[in-house]
């Protein structure tokens, strides 16, 4: 194998693939990156056996071939090199040689046959979405995913297909984010796929703001292809909890909130929350919302803003950081908040098909 590639192109490939390589693994070959050349294409592949990524770029190929080399050392070396182009070559049973100007480096390598094969997706069902739309949908839901391994199913994002609509949901049991998009699949088709959060984060990184993303659906895996990058991931096993009762909660009160103003006030009053509970009381009076937090070790914070509310006193407590996460993942000037009482969840919606649920916290007497 022998090829010449632009250092910038190589750097872009490394950025796309390096976070897929596992940091700690008992299987040495998984710390490698597989390098293949075909005609004038250079292909990099990395996997942790759950998430696999394959990236393609242009290169001047003199000899076709394939090797796998230790990714960490190789990535660090490329970062330190200064020449515009690099030459990489190897022969059967020999080390890989990296040449940069007058400098020459050799890395131990392994054969392609030692590297795990990518899962087959040839028979997978597929559909397309604008890459930017898929990226946004995942960004607006993945923040709510559980980071607790004990809640295994909730550590992934749900992709549900039904009636020609793709629904993406993330939840940790205390908050939920949901967004819908129409897709070009037969309305009779339905399926549910729980995507690991690592794969979701990689898909977000690989999706550009232009072009299409193709999604491949299989029984035990899904794949996304975009911008010369293919990601294949195994799915999380288990059944995602039924969230329909939560999102269909009847809201007796619906009001519009100025998003930026509420973000500012929540950041201020959150400084006075108890570190163990993080609770802010929302008090609604005619024309006004007051936010209150107090902590015996810190003091008390109280702020207010004008709202379009005309009922009797209504109080409910929320985690301000969960509320801020929701507000930060909307771009609207106004968001709609629906609540019914102090004990049922608040439902926040915006104009971009986003629906967010936040569970209330216990109200404490001031």
From Swiss-Prot:
GO biological process: DNA strand elongation involved in DNA replication
Molecular function in Gene Ontology: 3'-5' exonuclease activity; DNA binding; DNA-directed DNA polymerase activity
Coiled coil: none
CDD domains (UniProt xref): beta_clamp
InterPro entries registered for this protein in UniProt: DNA_clamp_sf, DNA_polIII_beta, DNA_polIII_beta_C, DNA_polIII_beta_cen, DNA_polIII_beta_N
Entries under Gene3D superfamilies matching the protein: 3.70.10.10, DNA Polymerase III, subunit A, domain 2 (3.10.150.10)
Signal peptide coordinates: none
Gene Ontology annotations for the cellular component aspect, listed alphabetically: cytoplasm; DNA polymerase III complex
Keyword vocabulary terms for this entry: Cytoplasm, DNA replication, DNA-binding, DNA-directed DNA polymerase, Nucleotidyltransferase, Transferase
Subcellular location per the Swiss-Prot or TrEMBL entry: Cytoplasm
Keyword presence, Cytoplasm: yes
Top-level taxonomic group: Bacteria
Pfam (any one): DNA_pol3_beta_2
Family recorded in the similarity comment: Belongs to the beta sliding clamp family.
Protein task: Confers DNA tethering and processivity to DNA polymerases and other proteins. Acts as a clamp, forming a ring around DNA (a reaction catalyzed by the clamp-loading complex) which diffuses in an ATP-independent manner freely and bidirectionally along dsDNA. Initially characterized for its ability to contact the catalytic subunit of DNA polymerase III (Pol III), a complex, multichain enzyme responsible for most of the replicative synthesis in bacteria; Pol III exhibits 3'-5' exonuclease proofreading activity.
Subunit structure: Forms a ring-shaped head-to-tail homodimer around DNA which binds and tethers DNA polymerases and other proteins to the DNA. The DNA replisome complex has a single clamp-loading complex (3 tau and 1 each of delta, delta', psi and chi subunits) which binds 3 Pol III cores (1 core on the leading strand and 2 on the lagging strand) each with a beta sliding clamp dimer. Additional proteins in the replisome are other copies of gamma, psi and chi, Ssb, DNA helicase and RNA primase.
Name by which UniProt lists this protein: Beta sliding clamp
Organism, as annotated: Chlamydia pneumoniae (Chlamydophila pneumoniae)
Gene: dnaN
């Amino acid at each position: 194998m022998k090829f010449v590639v632009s250092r910038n192109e190589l750097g872009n490939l490394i950025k796309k693939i390096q976070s897929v390589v596992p940091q700690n693994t008992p299987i040495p070959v998984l710390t490698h990156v597989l390098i293949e050349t075909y005609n004038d294409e250079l292909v990099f592949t990395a996997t942790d056996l759950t998430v696999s990524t394959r990236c393609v770029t242009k290169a001047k190929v003199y000899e076709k071939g394939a090797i796998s080399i230790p990714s960490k050392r190789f990535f660090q070396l490329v970062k330190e090199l200064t020449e515009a182009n690099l030459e990489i070559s190897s022969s059967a049973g020999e080390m890989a040689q990296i040449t940069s100007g007058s400098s020459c480096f050799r890395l131990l390598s392994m054969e392609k046959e030692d590297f795990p094969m990518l899962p087959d997706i040839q028979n997978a069902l597929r559909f397309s979405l604008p890459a930017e739309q898929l990226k946004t949908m995942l960004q607006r839901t993945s923040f709510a995913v559980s980071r607790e391994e004990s809640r295994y199913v909730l550590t992934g994002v749900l992709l549900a297909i039904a009636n020609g609509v793709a629904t993406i949901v993330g939840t940790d049991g205390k908050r939920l984010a949901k967004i819908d998009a129409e897709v070009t699949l037969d309305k009779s088709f339905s399926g549910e796929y729980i995507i690991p959060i690592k794969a979701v984060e990689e898909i977000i990184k690989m999706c550009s703001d232009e072009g299409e993303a193709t999604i491949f659906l299989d029984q035990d895996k899904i794949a996304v292809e975009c911008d010369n990058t293919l990601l294949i991931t195994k799915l999380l096993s288990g059944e995602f909890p039924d969230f329909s009762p939560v999102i269909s909660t009847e809201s007796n009160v619906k009001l519009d909130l100025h998003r930026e103003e509420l973000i500012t006030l929540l950041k201020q009053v959150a400084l006075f929350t108890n570190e163990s509970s993080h609770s802010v009381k929302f008090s609604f009076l005619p024309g006004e919302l007051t936010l209150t937090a107090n902590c015996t070790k810190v003091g008390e914070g109280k702020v207010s803003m004008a709202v379009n509310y005309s009922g009797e006193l209504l109080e409910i407590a929320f985690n301000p950081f969960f509320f801020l996460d929701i507000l930060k993942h909307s771009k609207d000037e106004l968001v709609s908040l629906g609540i019914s009482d102090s004990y049922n969840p608040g439902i926040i919606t915006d104009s971009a098909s986003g629906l967010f649920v936040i569970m209330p916290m216990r109200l404490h007497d001031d």
